[in-house]
Amino acid sequence: VFGAKVEAGRVDRRVSNPIIATPWLTADASEAVLEIPGAARFHVWQGRHVQVQVMPGASASVIRMWLEGMVASLVLIQQRRFALHASTIRVGGRLVAVAGPSGAGKSTTAALLAGRGHSIVTDEVTAVDFAVREGVVIPTVCPSGRRLRLRRETVERLGMSRDGGEEIIGTGKLGFPLVPTDHDELSLELVVVLRPEGGEVVSDVHALTGPAALTALITNTLRPYFCILQHQAHLRWIAGLASAVPIVQLDRPSNRWTGSRVAMLIEEAAMGGRDTDGLRPRHAAESNSTPRADLPVAPLTPSSAG
């Protein structure tokens, strides 16, 4: 998990002076104990080691779900690293992070873009680091190895085969393995924030700058409530990311399917069809769009492995 070694073993540790203290999680900046009733107890230490005590009857797919999500977030925080709650796709050779709250359509959008010939790099968790290249600070993303997780009804709507999708018990979702990328780190070039809205909303994009961009990045940080553990480092990360990458917001209606148009708008923004420094909302009427169910999701590997 992001370089941390994962081992099975009994978890008896307690965090003596926690900054976060809830019935299920105690944590400070370097240590955390997470307890998921009926699933497992996890001890995360210094961002380098994870010990897992699996409860009787817990399925491997559920344990992996927690390792890829909550535990991965704690590992990153202890490493003084941060992630966007985003799926990341290579669109026309450019790396785009599609962020948004749970249920905004991040994974669905990633699958739609994959069906249009693009490659999924990460799903839901996009850890962003900074590298210096020729004197310029560049935000970079490392593939997480996380599965693409889609609801069954989404799989059916997209016309995808369930072959190779592992059921994640208790979630109503299937996990599909992603094709490994041949790069260890990729330059992030655009962040798209999905914003579902009720009513007659036109799907369109507009640039976010200044406080609006900072607020969007803070809101779409993976589990932002964990960032109290590394508050100053998180603020520096937000400022660095906002100054290095265009941030755009994509408004879409929450009451009808607009997946194909959303995918097209992201392609336009990523591939230069629109000026991401000057995007403005449009107010023209939008017709209902329908998914292209005949498109295969090329970057997904049919496999029974989770």
Task: Tell what function each PLM region has.
Residues 295-306:
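Long, low-complexity, intrinsically disordered segments
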